[in-house]
Amino acid sequence: VNRGHKKSKLTVLLLSSVSIAVSAQDVSVCQSTLDNKARLACYDRIFGTTATMLTETTAAGEADVEVKPQTAAETEVVAEPVAVATVMQKYWELTPEEKRDRFVFRTYQPNFFLPAHITSNINKAPQSPTRGQAEASENYKQMESKIQVSLRAKLMTEFLLPGADLWFAFSQRSMWQLWNNQDSAPFRNTDYQPELMYIVPVSDAWGDLPGDWQVRMLQFGIAHQSNGQAKPLSRSWNKVYAGLAVDKGEFGLNWRYNQRISENGDEDDNPDLIDYIGSHEISANWLPGDATAQLTWRNDFSYLSRGSWQLDLTYPVDSSKMDGLRWHLQMFSGYGETLLDYNFRQNSIGLGVMLFNF
């Protein structure tokens, strides 16, 4: 731009000098012309031509310094990519953008009602080493209903570590002899589990794993589980646990180790509980679009023939309402579908609906 201005100024100065030189020689000729029209034409010939040259040169100089408009590529602002939170990050509020208020109830484990739950073998006379065998309930039917309600609420945010949250949760699972009219449809067993959970998010820099897997969080907790019944049907235990969760796209894995808090003598309703249900719990989740799938395996690795696996499949009743009612299919095989059945092996399948998810 500066070169263009300098060039224009130099051209103007040169033309001005030429104009002055021409005028000095010819002005006297014009002045001596007596005819008015001829004298005017003489002046126009001298000064008009110079003015035209100056105008054209000035325009050329301006063209030289004309600023070309920027192209779209030069003016385009490249936006920085925005990270999209994964399902796990949203569920546990692992990023600052996903944090929500405290003391608001949200779903924890699946909330469902399975009116048709069929087992291969109903536990009519539960027993344990310290409680003996209960009186048999001969009228119990292999087809019953299964209900679970599970909620959680965040108690503290940024607790002890950056981004870490303290949660409280309560879960209740019932086996209801809904189709047993002979015994007035009793509840065969209900398990209650309050717990405290400490969730610590793991940053991307520390959580990278091979194959694009990412460690998302560490979890620590303490829980009490019992069925609230009197002896000899009483079952209960306390535990602390630790684990971690990883994900990759629509897949997630959660591992947890449960350490039972020991009890003494007759206070222990079920001293061999861990031998049957196991201390390790691994859950694999798959979210392929509208459907969800979760496979949970529990085992102690000391008794591979024990433990259990459970498969949960859901699909929305109305695809336009993803958080509404969902069809729920559940399959179970092994020990410990309920606390009362911790040492009782069975295979079961249940069909119903997931009640709510928020």
Region spans (language model):
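Membrane-embedded beta-strand positions in outer-membrane beta-barrel channels/transporters
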Residues: E144, Q148-S150, Q193-E195, Y241, ...
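A cross-kingdom marker for long, charged
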Residues: F47-M53, H328, Y335-L339, G350-G352
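Long, repeat-rich segments with strong aromatic
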Residues: H280-T338, L355-N357
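Outer-membrane beta-barrel "beta-signal"
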Residues: Q193, L329, Q346-F358
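Short beta-strand-to-coil "C-cap" segments at the C-terminal boundary of structured domains/repeats
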Residues: D44-F47, V200, V353-F358
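Outer-membrane beta-barrel initiation region
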Residues: A51-D183, T190-E195
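Cleavable N-terminal export/targeting peptides
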Residues: V1-A85
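Outer-membrane pore/translocation modules
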Residues: N123-A134, K141, M156-W286, L295-N299, ...
